Amino acid sequence: MKNLPSKALSVAVSLALAAALPVVSEAQSAATKHQQAVLVTGASSGIGRKITERLAADGYFVYATARKDDDLKALGAIKNVQAVRLDVTKPQDIDAAVQTIKSGGRGLYGLVNNAGIGSDASVAEMKLEEFDLMMAVNMYGPYRMTQAFEPLIVEAKGRITNIGSISGILASPGLSAYAMSKHAIEAFTDSLAQELAPLGATANVVEPGNYNTDIVKNEIERGVAPPGTSADLSMDKPPDEVADAVEKALFEPNPKRRYLVVPIQRQAEKTIRKQIEQLVQLNEGQPYTYDHDALIKMLDEALSTARPRTK
């Protein structure tokens, strides 16, 4: 065999090595060059807008959804944000969003099911059409979005964060439909987390109190806000703490199943007390009632297995 000139030999070796390496698609290449991507629904205002701004500012890439042209334009002007037109009640919008994200080549690490609407009517007063719309947005919306995007989340070993509410725990008159929809998110998240765990993915729920958002303002004006709501301290606070909780739920190493985040201590106390009251009611009067000592032992065991607080 003839000796090849050194330049030709170098080229031959390079070609041989290139042939031995796996082919990297354009999508794979793009995914390695960009930040982790998160999809946030209902990003035009309130909690969704704050989540979008926080994640984008911290270097994550955010697909932020909205329905109106002006909102899409405003979201698209934020660095690290791509605005996506999406109405969670429209399957065709969801399908189009899936294709948009797939074609982006970044994959999808996180899904934040935030889109929601409020109500201010009792069961007797609420029209069935209003009830149907609320369930379509608040309950069916997260379900549809999760079905559509779960394959991408599982592929990335990522996380799904649902935005619940303390109204899912602290029901009050005039909020029956809203409380129902948010309580459904609690159960949905618990089941979803168990389904995702064997696949290496995670689901959790962030439960905000009454921050300065349009939904809470409307509840206060109508006099149907959950117990513990006031027009003073809580209304002075924008939902920055909610964005903090969502970022932790998405990215901290050992995420919790639930993140309670409220603007004032009174709301935290009422929420925890309500859970304790429900525990007492469940335990009382059934064939396998636990006594005081047994309940305290259960509480101690639960506290001992809880995550240590980070300073």
Task: Describe every region a protein language model picked out.
Residues S165:
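Residue(s) in the substrate-gating loop at a strand-loop-helix junction
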Residues P198-L260:
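SDR active-site lid
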Residues L86-A96, L128:
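The beta1-alpha1 cofactor-binding region of Rossmann-like NAD(H)/NADP(H)-dependent oxidoreductases
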